[in-house]
Amino acid sequence: QELWIVNTRFSCLCTLSNNYNFIPQWQPNFVSAIAPEDRCHLNGMAMVNGMPKYVTVLGETNTPGGWRSQKAHGGCILEVPSSEVITAGLSMPHSPRMHQGVLWVLNSGRGELITVDSHSGKQEIIMALPGYTRGLAIVGKYAFVGLSKIRETAIFGNLPISDRFDELKCGVAVVDLQTRQMISCLEFKSGVDEIFDLQAIAFSSAMISGPYAVTDGVNPIWSLPASAAPKY
């Protein structure tokens, strides 16, 4: 097995090498050359049996930054290696994941967590969330979704989510996939405006601290076993 990497700038999936910066392994069939031009903004990959199976792109485009003109509705999911379009009409999709045989994806420009039928391409909205959705980790029946405050720039302006919510949040939403309800949200009030990815790390206890603990005047929180507690 090898480490597969989504190479957005070169519009391909690649692996690493001691002799080269990277080795291109796959590119969408509409991308005619490996070039540092971000032609379709290939940004996410879902693995099946240790190999890439689905990828998200922001447009079926073959020119430098060509996806930008259709970012609100030009996104799609492609099958690997065929480049078959599984579903289209998405708004800046990110973070495809396979979980229990279901293809999940974030329809970021609409702030949605959705599922996609890999055979029919049918999209089903699980929940709309108050943020630009990017970064998805699923553990059991819970989905952890990254939320970002979009910037009013040429890239993020004029997206459907701007009309859907008056105010966007930055943080991590926890969604119960059975009830389709957001049961919790860790919101960053300051210091952080964007979440780029999420990973769930099982059986670990990390130190918890704000992004600027010294500035905030708070002490870090440490997790220790009960046996380490002082005995009075």
Model-found features: residue ranges?
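Beta-rich, blade/repeat-based domains predominating
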Residues: Q1-E2, V31-K53, G74, V85-V102, ...
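Conserved beta-propeller blade signature
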Residues: E2-I5, P52-T56, V102-V105, A143-V145, ...
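Short loop/turn segments immediately following the C-termini of beta-strands
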Residues: T8-F10, L58-E60, S108, S148-I150, ...
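Beta-propeller blade signature
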Residues: L16-Y20, Q70-P81, L159-T179
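A short beta-strand motif characteristic of beta-propeller blades
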Residues: I23-A35, S82-A88, G121-M127, I183-E187
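Short, conserved, GDST-rich strand-edge loop motifs in beta-rich repeat architectures
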Residues: V55-A72, G146-E167, G217-S223, A229
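Loop/turn-rich, solvent-exposed surfaces of beta-rich toroidal or solenoidal domains
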Residues: L90-L177
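Blade-level signature of beta-propeller repeat domains, shared across WD40, Kelch, NHL, RCC1
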Residues: L168-G171, L177-Y232
